[in-house]
Design a protein with these regions (language model features):
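A short beta-loop-alpha structural element at the N-terminal edge
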Residues: 1-16
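Active-site rim helix/loop that mediates acceptor-substrate recognition in acyltransferases
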Residues: 25-54, 62
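Short coil/loop residues immediately preceding or within conserved phosphate-binding loops
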Residues: 50, 77, 82, 143
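Conserved beta-strand in the GNAT
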Residues: 52-54, 60-70, 81, 86
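Conserved acetyl-CoA-binding loop-helix of GNAT-fold acetyltransferases
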Residues: 84-87, 93-106, 129
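Conserved GNAT acetyl-CoA-binding A-motif
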Residues: 101, 108-121
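C-terminal "cap" of GNAT-fold acetyltransferases
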Residues: 118-123, 136-155
Length: 155
């Protein structure tokens, strides 16, 4: 398996957008696959914020994860964010998500970022086992979500 910037593997853009849409469209009323693809293209990155990483094996897309500047507009002091962590269902529990999250953390460290934030309704326990701490819980897009933080100096 390889992990690299989506910007270097544009052929995964449409499939990534389809998968993100299928996973999260319930939280984004009015969203479309095309709009997702446009956002992913803008976030494709290549050593910058925002950046999207893809995990792949040959022609098979395994997953993706991103580093974005801000996820919660009403909390501009919380930045940057690990976002859009997605692993193909048939490939879960094989370390792909962990590898993608590590790629984002390493990108942040290269940019001298000392902490990362994440908002999730489903992955709080997963991240807690890896050093992330709950900062707050909030209702967002119809779900109770945890805003979590990772100190990259200690991690």
């Amino acid at each position: 398996m390889q992990i690299d910037y989506l910007a270097r593997h544009d052929h995964f853009l449409t499939e990534s957008a389809r998968r993100h849409f299928a996973e999260w469209s319930h939280s984004w009323p009015g969203d479309t696959v095309e709009a997702r693809a446009k956002r992913l293209r803008l976030r494709g990155g290549n050593g910058a914020i925002p950046s999207v990483f893809v995990a792949f094996e040959g022609p098979a897309l395994c997953g993706s994860a991103g580093l974005i500047q801000n996820y919660l507009p009403n909390r501009p002091n919380l930045e940057p964010w690990l976002a859009g962590v997605y692993v193909t269902p048939s490939m879960r529990r094989q370390g792909i998500g962990t590898a993608l999250v590590s790629a984002v953390q390493n990108e942040a460290r290269r940019r001298d970022i000392t902490r990362l934030y994440r908002c999730s309704a489903t992955a709080e326990r997963y991240h807690a086992c890896r050093g992330w701490v709950v900062l707050e819980r909030l209702h967002r897009r119809g779900e109770l979500q945890a805003v979590i933080i990772l100190d990259l100096v200690l991690a």
